[in-house]
Every structure is written in C-alpha cells, then in structure tokens.
Swiss-Prot record:
Keyword flag Lyase: yes
Catalyzed reactions: orotidine 5'-phosphate + H(+) = UMP + CO2
GO MF annotations, alphabetized: orotidine-5'-phosphate decarboxylase activity
Organism for this UniProt entry: Hapsidospora chrysogena
UniProt protein name: Orotidine 5'-phosphate decarboxylase
Source organism, top-level taxon: Eukaryota
Length: 376
C-alpha cells in the first residue's frame, strides 16, 4: 500500500492545503523555524516553567504544559502565568499546548475548558481530549471554542465618569447636553447630608438635595485591532522575523494512542478517534499518537508523538531504555521517518540536561533531519 501523500509533503505545502487555520499557521511556523520539536515542560513551579520556556523557546514550535502540576501558578488573566507564557510564545514563536486530557461528559469538559480559575481557552492555543467518554466530549469542546470565538470580534470597553454635584433646584437648562449622544447608561444617586458642598435653601425654606450624575459609557472595539493584536506583549517585544500573529482559532488534539506500556487504547478506540476528528475538522487539528493516522485522501491531520529520546551525545549506538514507570522511548529518526510523526514531544531528555539550549538544539536538529529525509 502506498504511503499517504502527507508523509511525502513538506510542511510548507501542507500549510497551503490544510483547512484548520491554526494547523496552517503551525506548519508555516515549523517551516520558518526549521523545527518540529515540542517541549513537554513538566516542571514543578511557575518560575521554572517560565525560565525553561524562555531558554528553549527559540528551538521549539510547541510548548506542552500541565498547569495543574505547577506550584505558584498565577491565575490573574492579564498578568498571570498563562499571560506570561503567551508573551514568551509571541517573542520566540511557539504555540502553547495545555495537556489537560479532558475526559468527562460534554458539559463538564466544556466548563473545564472555558471557566474556572484557569480559563484554559484564554491562553492555550491547543488542548487535548481523552475520548474514552465518547464523541460528545469532542463535540462539546468544539462548540465551546466556537462560542468563545464568536464573542471575540468586539470587546466592550467601559469608562465611568462622575459629574460635579449640583443642586436639584438649579435650572435644568444650565445642564450640558453635549455628551448625551455618548451616554449608553446613566445612573443618578442622591447624596444625603453635607459633604463639603454648600446647599442652598429654596424659597420655602427647604434644603436642596445634592445629585451626582454618574455616566457609564460603553465603546465597542474590534478584537482584531492593533491594540489586541499586541496581546500581552510589552513595548519592544517583536514577533519572530517573517512570522505573523497566530489566528485566534483554538485547536484540539485527540489522544488516540499512548507510548506507555500496557495502555488500553486499542485499534477500535483509535479508529473512533479518527472518525471524531473527521467530523470536526474545523476544530480538531490532529492526534497525539504513535503513528500517522491519515488514511483517506483528504485527511491532513497533524500527529504529535511523545516518548522521544536521543542517546547521550557521542554515544549514538547506546540502547534506549524506558524510565521504569511505563514510558517507552524511540528516536526521532524512527518516530518521524518510520512511524510518520510530524512533531516529536520531548520532556526529560531536555529538562534533565545541564545545558537546556544546547540539548534542545540537538533534538531539534535530529528531528528536522528525520523529516527532511522522509520528504526527500
């Protein structure tokens, strides 16, 4: 049987034909950076996570996180850990993949994705799902992402102004109506007592009341404006040369196969994952898998594969061993060249190195070489 066309297609070619906007962006990013490397940043605290992302960022195209294992994760939307990761992603040119492995009924996974303290959808470009509960979980996540995207075309910017207190018995004709057209809502609050503003008495001896007019003005701004395009990047932060902003679309990877020994993801389960992906091509980017699962002519799903490891430097013939906890390892050459992976996921192979940048480059170079030999 002939190999699927995607196995011989370059990333730049696939970027032109794939339908998912985020997949197209990722393929372009891979081609621009000459990288098909994802770092699994399984670290214990937020400071280390940000440090690792900054050090390794130039070599990777995807950063995989587990926010719930990171001590000190700051959930503040604008300045917290997710926002700071997004800033580094923009600086170095990579996407954020929160390895949440959603695995529950549809309503629950939708809330886990969009609500709660983490609000994963706000900062993670990509998430994944364990489809054991059924296809409904994929459908619910897709619907949640679509609703979130629909709310993005316009943002409501609210400003509040408080007018000078005045006496109610003053002539209404003295009021300035110049801003009446801008006022969406106004609330009038009566202030009892003398707060330092002189109160005149009326002709019948009664004291006039003090009224403060508070105006709430709402302005609708396009979410595609340059103001939002900068996102949380500070002045001076620049995109990687030649790289545009990533699309606002979110993406899903379906956990179709695992690299751990004795896992229960059989062929029937994997096929169900493929069918669900085909039903939601506008949201599903591809799979976390151990082999390429594209089989129909119009399939162009991306495959990210964990369990990647290189022998120690200068010991290329050394045998790869598992970690003693069920993980099984393979080289980039096998995963990409033989199994058909598009992106290899590396964790401890880089994280435990004395020089993170050097080791990340070693993995990037090996994975890219395997890809170029595959499409040659």
């Amino acid at each position: 049987m002939a190999p699927h066309p995607t196995l011989k297609s370059t990333y730049s070619t696939r970027a032109e034909t794939v339908t998912h906007p985020l997949s197209a962006y990722l393929y372009k990013l891979m081609d621009l950076k000459a990288s098909n490397l994802c770092l699994s940043a399984d670290v214990a605290n937020a400071r280390e996570l940000l440090h690792v992302a900054d050090k390794v960022g130039p070599s990777i195209v995807v950063l995989k996180t587990h926010y719930d294992m990171v001590a000190g994760w700051d959930f503040t939307p604008e300045t917290g850990t997710g926002a700071r990761l997004a800033k580094l992603a923009r600086k170095h040119g990579f996407l954020i993949f929160e390895d949440r492995k959603f695995g529950d009924i549809g309503n629950t996974v939708e809330l886990q994705y969009t609500q709660g303290a983490a609000r994963i959808i706000e900062w993670a470009h990509i998430v994944n799902v364990n489809m054991v509960p059924g296809k409904a979980s994929v459908t619910s996540l897709a619907n949640a992402a679509a609703k979130w995207l629909e709310r993005l075309p316009y943002e409501v910017k609210t400003s509040v102004t408080v007018g000078t207190p005045r006496n109610t018995d003053e002539d209404d004709d003295d009021e300035d109506d110049g801003n009446a057209g801008e006022m969406e809502r106004s609330h009038t609050f009566g202030l009892n007592g003398n707060n330092g503003v002189p109160i005149k008495e009326s002709s019948d001896g009664r004291k006039g009341s003090i009224v403060s007019v508070t105006t709430v003005t709402q302005q609708y701004e396009s979410a595609h404006s340059p103001r939002l395009t900068k996102t949380i990047a500070e002045e001076g932060d620049m995109l990687l040369a030649g790289l545009e902003e990533p699309p606002l679309n979110r993406g899903l990877l379906i956990l179709a196969q695992m690299s751990s020994a004795g896992n229960f993801m059989n062929a029937e389960y994997t096929q169900a994952c493929v069918e669900a992906a085909r039903e939601h091509k506008d949201f599903v980017m591809g799979f976390v898998s151990q082999e390429a699962l594209n089989s129909q002519p119009d399939d162009d799903f991306i495959h990210m594969t964990p369990g990647c490891q290189l022998p120690p430097e200068h010991e290329e013939d050394a045998e790869l061993r598992g970690d003693g906890k069920g993980q099984q390892y393979n080289t980039p050459e096998k995963l990409i060249g033989v199994c058909g992976a598009d992106i290899v996921i590396v964790g401890r192979g880089i994280l435990k190195a004395g020089d993170l940048q050097h080791e990340a480059e070693r993995y990037r170079s090996a994975a890219w070489k395997a890809y170029t030999e595959r499409v040659r």
